[in-house]
Amino acid sequence: MFEQFNGQKFNLIYSDPAWQFNNKKTGGSMKSGAAHHYKSTMSVDELKAMPIDDIAADDCILVMWYVGSMPQEALDVVKAWGFTLKNMNGFVWNKLTVNNNPLFGMGFWTRAGSESAIIAIKGKPKVASRSVRAVGFYEPESLDEILKHTIFSGTFKIGQHSEKPNEFREACVELAGDVPRIELFSRKRVKGWAVWGNEVGKLNKRKAA
C-alpha cells in the first residue's frame, strides 16, 4: 500500500479518512462529509487493516479527523494503527458559510457545525513548540501535559469539497516541528508534505483551472 515511500518513516501523520458507515435510521449506507467527494471510501475494518506501521516512525504523532457519531470506531482505528489516544478534540474546526455565518450542518440528534480531530501518539514524540494556540493559558512541561488541552480551535469557512483549512496543517507542524510528515487521503499537494491517496492533486487542479 505504501510501497512508493520505499520504507521511509514519518514522525507526523495527518489523516482525513473518507469514513463509510451504516445509517440505522434509513437502513442504507452513508458516507462522511469528506467521503462524498472521494472516488472510494473505506470501512472501519479496512481502515484498521492499513499497514500504518510501515510508515510510522518509532516516535510519531497522529492527527486524524473523524465522524462525530463514530467515536468508538475512531478509537478502534487509532488502536489498530498502534497509537495511544491523547485528545479526542485535539483540533476543532468550527465551520462558517461563505457569508461568515455558523454552518447549520447535518445530524439526527443535533445539527453539527464542526469537526474534530484526534491527537494520538506512538512512542515518545517531542513537542517542537510550547506556544501552539490553545483554549486558555498553560505552561506545559511534557507532551502528555500539552495534549490534555485542546491544542487549537479554529473558525474557518468551508472550502472546496470538504477540504480542511490549511491552518490545521500549519498547527500540526508547529506542534510536531519540521519533521518528516505525511498526509493520508490527501487531495492536495502541499510543500513539505508527503502525500498518499487515490485523488492526490485533485484540489490543486481545480484551483488552477
Task: Describe every region a protein language model picked out.
Residues 1-209:
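Class I S-adenosyl-L-methionine-dependent methyltransferase catalytic core
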